[in-house]
Amino acid sequence: MARRPRPDGPQHLLALVRSAVPPVHPAGRPFIAAGLAIAAVGHRYRWLRGTGLLAAAACAGFFRHPQRVPPTRPAAIVAPADGVICAIDSAAPPAELSMGDTPLPRVSIFLSILDAHVQRAPVSGEVIAVQHRPGRFGSADLPEASDDNERTSVRIRMPNGAEVVAVQIAGLVARRIVCDAHVGDKLAIGDTYGLIRFGSRLDTYLPAGAEPIVNVGQRAVAGETVLAECR
């Protein structure tokens, strides 16, 4: 009779580490490598070695890509980002998407530098538009950030025909928006599609008639917190 593998040793330790430490988004690897390189080059100098290791650890935490379990309800619209809900209002979607000027329900999430900064699809559907618009790099927690700051908008059409727009907005420190979504892509709810480096904001425009079920000041978990349900 074959023996069962022992629950110890290097492989078991590696499995425990993988289960406890979130993986890193590919966009963060160059930053982590730079920190490790500084530590290696300056290994004879404690302050330089420590600075490099600290920078690498900080970047690993910032670019973490934790696993998430989206809800199974087909009508759910989930948060596209971790952070604090800073505004719930109505506004016309970004003009570059050519969706008209009729106000739609909007939920805004502010991401601090301590939040995970990967973005996830708020719904399942097809990407029908991706538009980038240059702009300012003002503080992302201010109301005018939605209109003035640099942004990338992703428009997703659900199987029932309803549309949801997720807008990545650069901030005072975050000056690099990464969007991996392209027109024609089929996304499942909770799929990772982008990242904003070092602090930012996410605006989610809901279908007309959808009512947000979250509150200002509430913490949102990307891919899991339900913002609203599509009627």
Swiss-Prot record:
The active site is at S200. It is found in: Cell membrane. Its main location: membrane. Keywords: Cell membrane, Decarboxylase, Lipid biosynthesis, Lipid metabolism, Lyase, Membrane, Phospholipid biosynthesis, Phospholipid metabolism, Pyruvate, Zymogen. Is synthesized initially as an inactive proenzyme. Formation of the active enzyme involves a self-maturation process in which the active site pyruvoyl group is generated from an internal serine residue via an autocatalytic post-translational modification. Two non-identical subunits are generated from the proenzyme in this reaction, and the pyruvate is formed at the N-terminus of the alpha chain, which is derived from the carboxyl end of the proenzyme. The keyword Transmembrane does not apply. GO terms for biological process: phosphatidylethanolamine biosynthetic process. Binds 1 pyruvoyl group covalently per subunit. It is a peripheral membrane protein. The record marks G199, S200 as: Cleavage (non-hydrolytic). PANTHER family: ARCHAETIDYLSERINE DECARBOXYLASE PROENZYME-RELATED (PTHR35809:SF1). Heterodimer of a large membrane-associated beta subunit and a small pyruvoyl-containing alpha subunit. Catalyzes the formation of phosphatidylethanolamine (PtdEtn) from phosphatidylserine (PtdSer). This is Phosphatidylserine decarboxylase proenzyme. It comes from Mycobacterium tuberculosis (strain ATCC 25177 / H37Ra).
